[in-house]
């Protein structure tokens, strides 16, 4: 994706620069979804092995939930890092080429919306 960047290391999942970014929140909906996906994976595992779906292997279901949340946490950290790099490059380009991005004139809501005439 970003192979042309200087200093790019090909087989590194999360570079050291990602440590400066704030960590994802633990109640992020995407992490909750990953935990739910892990729980459903545990249920599917029980179903495929013909065990009682909800009651058998609760420790395995907990293991699936924690491992999916753990993997999702680092996936979110990587996604946030890639978005930060993209934003940094984009804003750097905007700073270097201001003639391509002229300032728009500010309009008030009165100029945008139609006048309001109440009907009685």
Curated annotation (Swiss-Prot):
* InterPro entries attached to this UniProt entry: NDUC2 (IPR009423)
Q: Which domain of life is it from?
A: Eukaryota
- The main location class comes to mitochondrion
Name of the featured protein: NADH dehydrogenase [ubiquinone] 1 subunit C2
Subunit info here reads: Complex I is composed of 45 different subunits. Interacts with TMEM242.
Q: Which organism is it from?
A: Mus musculus
Localisation: Mitochondrion inner membrane
Q: Which UniProt keywords apply?
A: Electron transport, Membrane, Mitochondrion, Mitochondrion inner membrane, Respiratory chain, Transmembrane, Transmembrane helix, Transport
GO CC terms: mitochondrial inner membrane; mitochondrion; respiratory chain complex I
What membrane topology does the UniProt entry give? Single-pass membrane protein
Q: In Gene Ontology terms, what is a biological process of this protein?
A: positive regulation of mitochondrial membrane potential
Q: What does this protein do?
A: Accessory subunit of the mitochondrial membrane respiratory chain NADH dehydrogenase (Complex I), that is believed not to be involved in catalysis but required for the complex assembly. Complex I functions in the transfer of electrons from NADH to the respiratory chain. The immediate electron acceptor for the enzyme is believed to be ubiquinone.
Q: Transmembrane region positions?
A: 57-76
Carries keyword Lipoprotein?
Answer: no
**PANTHER family assigned to the protein according to its UniProt record, in alphabetical order:** NADH DEHYDROGENASE [UBIQUINONE] 1 SUBUNIT C2-RELATED (PTHR13099:SF0), NADH-UBIQUINONE OXIDOREDUCTASE SUBUNIT B14.5B (PTHR13099)
Homology family? Belongs to the complex I NDUFC2 subunit family.
